[in-house]
Amino acid sequence: MTRAEEFERLRPLLFSIAYRILGSVSEAEDAVQETWLRYAASPTQPTSTKAFLSAVVTRVSIDVLRSARVRREKYVGQWLPEPLLTDPYQDPERSAELADSVSMAALLLLERLTPLERAVFVLREVFGFGFPEIASAVGRSEAACRQLAVRARRHVDEGRPRFEADRREREELAGRFFDAFREGDVDGLRELLSADVQLAGDGGGKAPQLARSIIGAEKVARV
């Protein structure tokens, strides 16, 4: 198998890692492309291509996230993660972790973490990497990575609701919400929204958007 063929085989995994670290499809695609350039230019073939490329895309994504956060501080309006409509990477053994980690709620929780914490959390909690692999990927000792994982988990848990809704119940409510939204059913939307719901808008840093969050079921339902 050529390098190009091996890379294409692993591209879905690499993109999925980058996306969960960055929260942006375009930035994840750029990180994957940079990973390919570094792999193509490498003078030797790594023993484990998967481990090598996973480490490279992780390091690239950390660097991109650090610079992206500086840009986001100057962002016009409120920056929100970019939804991923279809995840190209599938692993039956980690389907629940993969599905949960691309929800908007999960991506917003990951915004609470430093770039290193986020990378360690993604590799460990979402993809099930061992600490030796994670240490190699982020350039830290295994002990340091374990500490980063503990801190990341604590920050994420602090941001989670006290009670998790059943997955099927969430899917049913989401379906009812989108049906009401599509049909312009204001009363139906109001019934589904909590009294203290907040609506935040993201205009991509360019397009007109909400000047501030809208609070309250009645107001949000009528937007």
Residue ranges and their predicted role:
Residues 164-168, 180, 207-215:
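A short glycine-/small-residue-rich loop at the edge of a beta-strand within enzyme catalytic domains
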